[in-house]
């Protein structure tokens, strides 16, 4: 992944941007991340208690927030109030207009055609982007998003596939929901527009499904992701305030990288919630692979991995709660965890803990650091949904089949 973005300008003022670094949109990290963990667990338990009241309830607090409404398509922006965890304040285009994508083409990435997805995401104002019909969108170059945008695939079968994919670079308040993103390719060495007034030269991209680079307040929910050139969801270079939830991930090697490098200490501010995802068939490693920050991994279903599930380096804090881990049959790869680039004398001081996880077929988690010490006391005050029920909570992971006039 990279940060090169050379702006061409329509004015002398814009030309000055050629010599400046991109604006870094920072998000102040939560000073007590355990309180966010506690809030997530409270919402999970509240949804569980409401199962007897809501006939459509699942115990998944995100889904129970909006999926019971048969008129969801008339109140699409309500979804923005349903996130949990570190990305809960990502409002996307909640306060803007609805933009309907009517054209699946992507012929001109410098002057995108109105009605295309690219034309929608580069606008300066908040927009809630929906799709007029089922579409397969093959992007010619990276889809560079502007701030305060929601991509909402509900009501259509939307595939972003076979070309470049989504880049969230130095922007904030992004929601990506209900789309299929797969077979992403490396692109680049081309001019690409990133706003109505600027376009710039993009160097070669890695081919991630969703690349978050210096982004904040980002929520990726109910997407199906697979088979891309590099990562499925990668977040680096100071990205933070992220929730990754209800996604179905499959057929991929390096699934999720959270943190740029061991030496990039700005990622100490990274805080990510990973909840209710199904890590499915054909996955190898990095579910996720973490550096520096705080990572809450809660109520996910791990049914396949070939090397390891959760790994990291540079002393990240990993809080694993109520997940289900089904190990592969190969006895060499039963361990859930992988401590990287450090001897045991160092990694034993990191804070990796497992609470209420379910381990099947010989799976095991190697904890480190304080474990259930005071640093986790607040996070432990309420447990996540029991891991034995994870299969039901994640049964609808991935892009949903939603039709107007009925519940999703």
From Swiss-Prot:
Gene3D superfamilies linked: Single-stranded right-handed beta-helix, Pectin lyase-like
Q: Which residues form the signal peptide?
A: 1-27
State what protein this is by name. Answer: Probable pectate lyase 5
Residues where Ca(2+) binds: 206, 230, 234
Q: What is the lineage of its organism?
A: Eukaryota, Viridiplantae, Streptophyta, Embryophyta, Tracheophyta
Enzyme class, one word? lyase
Q: Where is the active site?
A: 286
A GO MF term: metal ion binding
Glycosylated residue positions: 45
Q: Which cofactor does it need?
A: Ca(2+)
Q: Pfam families, alphabetically?
A: Pectate_lyase_4 (PF00544)
- Which protein family is it in? Belongs to the polysaccharide lyase 1 family.
Catalyses which reaction? Eliminative cleavage of (1->4)-alpha-D-galacturonan to give oligosaccharides with 4-deoxy-alpha-D-galact-4-enuronosyl groups at their non-reducing ends
- EC number(s): the record gives 4.2.2.2
Q: How is the cofactor bound?
A: Binds 1 Ca(2+) ion. Required for its activity.
Would you name any one GO CC term?
Answer: mitochondrion
The biological pathway it contributes to is:
Glycan metabolism; pectin degradation; 2-dehydro-3-deoxy-D-gluconate from pectin: step 2/5
InterPro entries in alphabetical order: AmbAllergen, Pec_lyase, Pectin_lyas_fold, Pectin_lyase_fold/virulence, PEL
Q: Which organism is it from?
A: Arabidopsis thaliana
GO BP annotations of the record are: pectin catabolic process
